[in-house]
Amino acid sequence: MRHRKSGRQLNRNSSHRQALFRNLASALVSHEIIKTTLPKAKELRRVVEPLITLAKVDSVANRRLAFARTRNIETVAKLFNELGPRFANRAGGYTRILKCGFRAGDNAPMAYIELVDRPEVAAEQAAE
């Protein structure tokens, strides 16, 4: 029985899942919009939103916690220098998931996950 077990397994072992979400979180922070499968997008939301909340208070301890969770200096720098101040007045809900059809090869449901309040420049690049 799987009572009180939160999170999706996604047919991966725990280290593979951890690496997957580290990479997806870094990609989302750097590009501000990514296309992935719907279950991965829903689970990625649980990883990225606490990171952005952590980035709202810039301290050495918070930077170290963020680095421990992402293992990427560029991601931590963007979190604390850009995204933390951008979402300082927002109390949560930093991401938006938009369904975008099904993948051609295996008919998996696909979705865009993006950061809300993206600059217009990033929105134009994503459209191209």
Swiss-Prot record:
One of its GO terms (cellular component) is cytosolic large ribosomal subunit. The keyword Ubl conjugation does not apply. Transmembrane segments: none annotated. SUPFAM superfamilies: Prokaryotic ribosomal protein L17 (SSF64263). Keywords: Ribonucleoprotein, Ribosomal protein. Part of the 50S ribosomal subunit. Contacts protein L32. HAMAP family: Ribosomal_bL17. This is Large ribosomal subunit protein bL17. The lineage of its organism: Bacteria, Pseudomonadati, Pseudomonadota, Gammaproteobacteria, Pasteurellales.
